[in-house]
């Protein structure tokens, strides 16, 4: 089963879950050699690709805490959260290196910076000054003795913008990530299975990409990661068609761009069966367009960074399936029902 990634150094990189597991152990050894210990925070400023996926697993499984940083935040916010988290190592995508110039001298907690590319593709501005990801893991064993620790130990760290003041840090435990992965694979939730091919457009720096990297590993699902092209409709449609994508996940603005592109070009995505949409309310017109013109079911989800993050999903009950189309669309426009593990209370 493949993980397909768009990166700056490889337009269409392919690897298997076996490869990811092997390189994850190499990365864990490299981090250990760099002095990273259980409980330490390791940050990423990166898009969705296979190297970021390896970071997800290496950092958390060695007992450290994976801190995915949103590169779209204001520089002052980036400075604050990196220092607040006390990140010791920072992995950065080469396309985001200009952020380093803004942060230079302002993040003293960071002891090491690694550029997420190969030596051959290193930008001239940092060549010889910073290590590439590939040189960082090169030469390290692909065997690693994973430690045993309490399931409630911190696994990953995301910052939520909140409503006032600075962004707030939310720690995910290993337990919450595993339970969320189980819940997401249930048929009446997202229904991720080994028969799917998932296009994760939702960023890996946004609430753990809604848990999809864990769902995919749990089920052995083919995962398609669009890298820095996550907002490019032409690339997304091409990935859907060449990789046989059956399910995609992202915010409404992405799907607006995609639907407009498909309408203008006449292109289709015949293998796509459903989209998981969250982040903001889904317009009823989008639900109708997806279903009537493309045969795609829209699953609207609601959640928060604090809920790991999925809280509800809009799958239909059996008695709703026979409703007229307009009424079904109205149901899909709602936030749906709570998923396993979520306690909810409706307050008037």
Q: At which residue positions do the language-model features occur?
A:
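Conserved AMP-binding
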Residues: 46-49, 70, 192, 201-206, ...
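Conserved AMP-binding/adenylation subdomain of ANL enzymes
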Residues: 178-197, 207-246, 261
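Structural core segment of the AMP-binding/adenylate-forming
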Residues: 33-34, 61-135, 149, 251
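Gly/Ser/Thr-rich phosphate-binding loop
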Residues: 218, 245-250, 259-330, 343-345
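Conserved AMP-binding/adenylate-forming core of the ANL superfamily
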Residues: 2-49, 53-57, 74-79, 129-135
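Hydrophobic alpha-helical segments in the ANL/AMP-binding
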Residues: 32, 50-69, 78-79, 185-188, ...
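Conserved adenylate-forming
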Residues: 31-36, 140-152, 157-199, 211-212, ...
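A short helix-loop-beta submotif of the ANL/AMP-binding
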Residues: 41, 47-67, 71-75, 83-89, ...
């Amino acid at each position: 089963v493949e993980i397909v990634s768009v990166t700056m150094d490889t337009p269409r990189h392919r690897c298997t879950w076996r490869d990811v597991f092997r390189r994850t152990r190499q990365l864990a050894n490299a981090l250990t050699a760099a002095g990273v210990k259980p409980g330490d925070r390791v940050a990423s400023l990166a898009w969705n690709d296979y190297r970021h996926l390896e970071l997800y697993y290496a950092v958390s499984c060695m007992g450290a805490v994976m801190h995915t940083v949103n590169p779209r935040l204001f520089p002052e916010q980036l400075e604050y959260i990196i220092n607040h988290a006390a990140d010791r190592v920072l992995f950065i995508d080469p396309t985001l290196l200009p952020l380093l110039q803004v942060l230079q001298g302002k993040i003293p907690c960071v002891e090491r910076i690694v550029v997420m590319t190969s030596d051959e593709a290193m930008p001239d501005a940092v060549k010889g000054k910073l290590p590439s990801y590939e040189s960082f893991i090169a030469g390290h064993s692909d065997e690693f003795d994973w430690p045993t620790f309490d399931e409630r130990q911190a696994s990953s760290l995301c910052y939520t913008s909140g409503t006032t003041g600075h962004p707030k840090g939310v720690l995910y435990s290993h337990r919450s990530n595993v339970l969320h992965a189980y819940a997401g694979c249930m048929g009446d939730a997202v229904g991720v299975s080994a028969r799917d091919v998932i296009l994760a457009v939702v960023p890996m720096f946004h609430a753990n990409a809604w848990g999809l990297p864990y769902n995919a590993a749990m089920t052995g699902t083919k995962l398609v990661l669009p890298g820095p092209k996550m907002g490019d409709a032409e690339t997304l449609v091409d990935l859907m068609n060449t990789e046989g994508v059956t399910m995609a996940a992202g915010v409404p603005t992405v799907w607006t761009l995609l639907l407009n592109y498909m309408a203008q070009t006449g292109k289709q995505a015949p293998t796509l069966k459903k989209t998981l949409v969250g982040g903001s309310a889904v317009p009823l017109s989008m639900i109708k367009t997806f279903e009537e013109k493309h045969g795609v079911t829209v699953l609207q989800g609601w959640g928060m960074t604090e809920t790991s993050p999925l809280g509800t999903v809009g799958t239909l009950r059996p008695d709703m399936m026979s409703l007229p189309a307009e009424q079904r669309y109205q149901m899909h426009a709602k936030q749906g029902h709570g998923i396993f593990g979520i306690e909810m209370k409706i307050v008037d």
